[in-house]
Amino acid sequence: LTLGARGRRTRSPSPTLGESLAPRKGSFSGRLSPAYSLGSLTGASPRQSPHAQRKLSSGDLRVPIPRERKNSITEISDNEDDLLEYHRRQRQERLREQEMERLERQRLETILNLCAEYSRADGGPETGELPSIGEATAALALAGRRPSRGLAGAIVVSGRSGEESGGASQRLWESMERSDEENLKEECSSTESTQQEHEDAPSTKLQGEVLAVEEERAQVLGRVEQLKVRVKELEQQLQEAAREAEMERALLQGEREAERALLQKEQRAMDQLQEKLVALETGIQKERDKEADALETETKLFEDLEFQQLERESRVEEERELAGQGLLRSKAELLRSVSKRKERLAVLDSQAGQIRAQAVQESERLAREKNAVLQLLQKEKEKLTVLERRYHSLTGGRPFPKTTSTLKEVYRSKMNGDMASPLPRTRSGPLPSSSGSSSSSSQLSVATLGRSPSPKSALLAQNGTSSLPRNLAATLQDIETKRQLALQQKVELPPAEPLSPEDPAGHQVIEEQRRRLAELKQKAAAEAQCQWDALHGAAAFPAGPSGFPTLMHHSILHHLPAGRERGEEGEHAYDTLSLESSDSMETSISTGGNSACSPDNMSSASGLDMGKIEEMEKMLKEAHAEKSRLMESREREMELRRQALEEERRRREQVERRLQSESARRQQLVEKEVKLREKQFSQARPLTRYLPNRKEDFDLKTHIESSGHGVDTCLHVVLSSKVCRGYLIKMGGKIKSWKKRWFVFDRLKRTLSYYVDKHETKLKGVIYFQAIEEVYYDHLRSAAKSPNPALTFCVKTHDRLYYMVAPSAEAMRIWMDVIVTGAEGYTQFMN
């Protein structure tokens, strides 16, 4: 029994143990049913539990197939709640199994105790020699219960141990039958002996005892038969239990093989996953190395681009300074040019003033000449009137004959009308009679024709009965009015802006005006001479009354200077003939044509001079307008330049202010650092433990290793006996930016050089040993914007302080001890 219970406990619990407990519990109290046999396994599924297979009726034994594992731990390994539930369920099943095993153990002990009591009650010595299986069988028969699974397991185990001798269980049952027969024989013999001993007793008593013995014997025989039947049933149950155990063993063996196959499969999958993991790690490492190389390449490219950008910025700064200096020089030159031009403009203004004064004097002279001519004209007109009256009185009212002098008068009137061309020509009506003209001609004076405010109206008012031609008077008044307007404009005109002395346009305009003025004067003189010659030439050819107009047209009028007069001659050839009466034409001037400087010629010359003066003034106005336009454009250009210079000045002021603030801030930082250094002067060289070594046979690597540094374990430094190489991050001198540089400490060249990269092709700087004064740790954190202040150290030279950042603390210590061996500028120890 102990072996059976132990074998049951050592067997691994099946996942379907909770499902098979119910039929097991039922089998402990009830008898074995006929259906509960091996023949009921016909349609059993190989994936069902062995207890379910025992309930089925089938005679054939199939190859065991692994059962389906439900609620396996491999299915719920990802869910923590399911794992906790699985653990709790398994614990409850184990507790329930332990409780059932305890109950079975108590029941078996009870059965054994009953068997022992029964054996003692029988008193047969042979019964004590029966094996425990017989006692258990008898106890089971008395208890009337089905043997438990533990007992069946014990019987199966004992049966398996006796299979080597063959038929052990059959011998057990035979010995049990023999013991039963012996018991019966003993009972019979004991009964017979008791009968023989009590034969002498009374018959009634004997009969009663015989009956009692017979009844008891009948009961014993009945019990014996029952026990035999029970023994046979138990034998069948034992055989069935053996078959069930064998089948369960086969099922467990199949399940074990299936689990082993799954285990091998999972083992192979795990090996494959391990190989994949190794390959993945290798690929990741390769990718990481590739990315590191790419990053290093990009970093180098970025450093190169940044250096180029800094160079461009410095170059742009220099170009801006040069441009600023050029602008300042240009500004100075422009200021000098402006001063020169102002001087030239002052000179031109003075010249223009002189020209205006000369023009005013010339106009005044011409006005005086005109007044004198008008006075002479008035005198001649008065003479003419007197002559007409005398001729009229002498001839009895007959007019003067029309002679060449009358034609000259007509020509002079025509010329005066042409000189007054800005005013429209009007046809005059016939003048009043000579009687009326003689009465009003004496009233005409120089003041009336000269400078009256409204000379035309006054002349017409006073000339109502005069014989003076009205068109001629209007022409003279128009000339005087234009002269007065020109003088008023000159007086009212504000002083023009002076032309630039170096402006070629203004100078050219003035020269052109002067040249045109001279040409106009020459043309006026030539025309006056030509007209005078033409008039005197026409007087030498007398003509009849009928042929005079044609002679007038071809001999005199074709000498007019412009085609406009010729074109208008067809329409207005005799416009001025109506200014006088027919008798006045015949009795016109008799002595006027004999003078070389007639009043009409003088008035014509004065009209030409006034036109030229007006033209000159117009050209002066145009020159002033051109000068104003040029000055405005020049002023705009100067304003743009001034704005650009002002913007540049403001920008420079801002830069200077920022520079001053930065200088002040740096000065404060320097003062603070000096104060801290004065307080901590003892820590000026915290890690420089060695003095510079100038020996030729000095081994740098041995020296560093003897100092306690792990050179071989530090991958950031490449150290040999004479040279030390590695990357350091250095702060720039002018531009405070941090750059990664490849440093080379060479004891043969006695220099500390740094390059762009480890190829050592582009040298960025050299520090000679004689210039290195100190090497110390930056304990004051004075490096601006250091990438790693904890790994920053300083290399002090004669003219500069280098800030460097090492990639690791060990590399920083190695570099400091390496560089200090070449600090030959540190001469304080010699004192």
Swiss-Prot record:
Q: Where is the composition biased (Basic and acidic residues)?
A: 174-188
- Identify the SMART domains for this entry: PH
Q: Where is the PH domain?
A: 721-824
Coiled coil: which residue ranges? Answer: 180-306, 610-676
Region (Disordered) residue spans? 1-73, 160-209, 416-465, 584-603
Biased composition (Basic residues) is annotated at 1-11
Q: Which residues carry this modification: Omega-N-methylarginine?
A: 6
Q: What is known of its domains?
A: The PH domain mediates the binding to phosphoinositides.
Spell out the protein name for this chain. Answer: Pleckstrin homology-like domain family B member 1
Q: Please give the organism.
A: Rattus norvegicus
